[in-house]
């Protein structure tokens, strides 16, 4: 088991990474709580909820609630339902919420914790590769039908407990989804990791190699978060690939593609725009081939959908005064945020579409 620490403006919190940690969560929670409220989804709960409960001999002060798996669960309805469950089960300001699951569970449970009685403690127990990113940094949110993660807060957990044994049961689309965020972190701040990934197929990566990638990705995320917790400056760089990625998620429908698969396509687009904006050459074709080789869906769109995509990108949280703010690369490990008006974005989307049609 390894321990890392993230220093936030509010406090510092530990990240524990190891095997079998789900059986002994109580060992990593020093504070005594009046109630524990475990929030999970139907897929994760059916596999791992009993393992977590095994670590608590008395279930007297433990309650749990299961939501449907999938992005559509990050909704106002589920948020309200969980607040009601917390109240009916007697949670108070000295209770703890445990988010057992992937990014959807972590985002939703974190927002419930941030707002219940004006904020109570919660811990993240991520069970996906993707959640190595979302569980660190304290960004919690639910979706609105007009866009992704538009209702949320910055509210760091008191701990992240990452049992990497749970990653062994992930389906292929969730594996692809998680590695997209690791690719993003490599492009932003770890070229060695990025190039190493391009040299491997996902099927060939062994558990010990995955653990190395996860730790490196978490280090990238934590270093940035420690400098800019509330995304006033450099934390925006962690949104590389997300401007188009979130828009693609919306037009394709939440749950029809994974977040990471959408971000992977957004990364390609970000490299394309960067090459045109800065007149440079980036590993666009290498990344495209790696995505194809690892069976990522290459998402297309029509000329008619470009206007819709632009409007969705303008609802992105980075946008200022209706102007799209997009994270680009001057080179690998050198991210920058630029402003793009509608005509510039339309041109970039059109040239990207033409480029992709030739591949």
Swiss-Prot record:
Cofactor annotation comment: Binds 1 divalent metal cation per subunit. Can use either Co(2+) or Zn(2+).
Organism: Oceanobacillus iheyensis (strain DSM 14371 / CIP 107618 / JCM 11309 / KCTC 3954 / HTE831)
Pathway listed: Metabolic intermediate biosynthesis; chorismate biosynthesis; chorismate from D-erythrose 4-phosphate and phosphoenolpyruvate: step 2/7
CDD domains: DHQS
GO molecular function annotations of the record: 3-dehydroquinate synthase activity; metal ion binding; nucleotide binding
GO biological process, one term: amino acid biosynthetic process
Functional summary from the UniProt entry: Catalyzes the conversion of 3-deoxy-D-arabino-heptulosonate 7-phosphate (DAHP) to dehydroquinate (DHQ).
Annotated InterPro entries: Dehydroquinate_synthase (IPR050071), DHQ_synth_AroB (IPR016037), DHQ_synth_fam (IPR030963), DHQS/DOIS_N (IPR030960), DHQS_C (IPR056179)
Family label: Belongs to the sugar phosphate cyclases superfamily. Dehydroquinate synthase family.
Protein name: 3-dehydroquinate synthase
PANTHER family according to UniProt: 3-DEHYDROQUINATE SYNTHASE (PTHR43622), 3-DEHYDROQUINATE SYNTHASE, CHLOROPLASTIC (PTHR43622:SF7)
Enzymatic reactions: 7-phospho-2-dehydro-3-deoxy-D-arabino-heptonate = 3-dehydroquinate + phosphate
Cellular compartments annotated: Cytoplasm
Binding-site list for Zn(2+): 181, 242, 259
Keywords: Amino-acid biosynthesis, Aromatic amino acid biosynthesis, Cobalt, Cytoplasm, Lyase, Metal-binding, NAD, Nucleotide-binding, Zinc
Assigned EC number: 4.2.3.4
Cellular component annotations (GO), alphabetically ordered: cytoplasm
Residues binding NAD(+), per UniProt: 69-74, 103-107, 127-128, 139, 148, 166-169
Cofactor: NAD(+); Co(2+); Zn(2+)
């Amino acid at each position: 088991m390894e321990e890392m620490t993230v220093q936030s403006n509010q406090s510092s919190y530990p990240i524990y990474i190891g095997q079998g940690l789900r059986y002994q969560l109580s060992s990593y929670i020093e504070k005594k709580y009046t109630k524990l409220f475990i929030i999970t989804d139907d897929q994760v709960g059916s596999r791992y909820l009993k393992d977590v409960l095994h670590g608590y001999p008395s279930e007297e002060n433990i309650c749990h609630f299961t939501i449907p798996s999938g992005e559509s669960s990050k909704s106002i309805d589920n948020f309200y339902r969980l607040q009601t469950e917390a109240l009916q089960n007697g949670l108070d300001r000295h209770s703890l919420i445990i988010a057992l699951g992937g990014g959807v569970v972590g985002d939703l449970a974190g927002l419930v914790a941030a707002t219940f009685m004006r904020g109570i403690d919660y811990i993240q127990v991520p069970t996906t590769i993707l959640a190595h990113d979302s569980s660190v940094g304290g960004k919690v949110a639910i979706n609105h039908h007009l866009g992704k993660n538009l209702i949320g807060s910055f509210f760091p957990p008191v701990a992240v407990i990452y049992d990497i044994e749970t990653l062994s049961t992930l389906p292929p689309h969730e594996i692809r989804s998680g590695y997209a965020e690791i690719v993003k972190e490599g492009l932003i701040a770890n070229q060695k990791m990025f190039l190493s990934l391009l040299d491997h197929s996902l099927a060939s990566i062994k558990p010990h190699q995955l653990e190395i990638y996860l730790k490196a990705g978490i280090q990238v995320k934590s270093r940035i978060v420690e400098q800019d917790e509330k995304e006033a400056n450099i934390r925006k760089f962690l949104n590389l690939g997300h401007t188009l990625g979130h828009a693609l998620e919306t037009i394709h429908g939440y749950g029809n593609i994974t977040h990471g698969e959408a971000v992977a396509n957004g990364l390609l687009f970000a490299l394309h725009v960067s090459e045109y904006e800065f007149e440079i050459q980036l590993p666009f074709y290498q990344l495209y081939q790696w995505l194809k080789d690892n069976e990522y869906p290459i998402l297309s769109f029509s000329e008619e959908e470009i206007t819709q995509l632009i409007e969705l990108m303008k609802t992105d949280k980075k946008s200022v005064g209706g102007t799209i703010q997009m994270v680009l690369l001057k080179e690998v490990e050198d991210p920058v945020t630029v402003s793009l008006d509608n005509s510039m974005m339309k041109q970039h989307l059109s040239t990207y579409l033409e480029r992709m049609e030739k591949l």
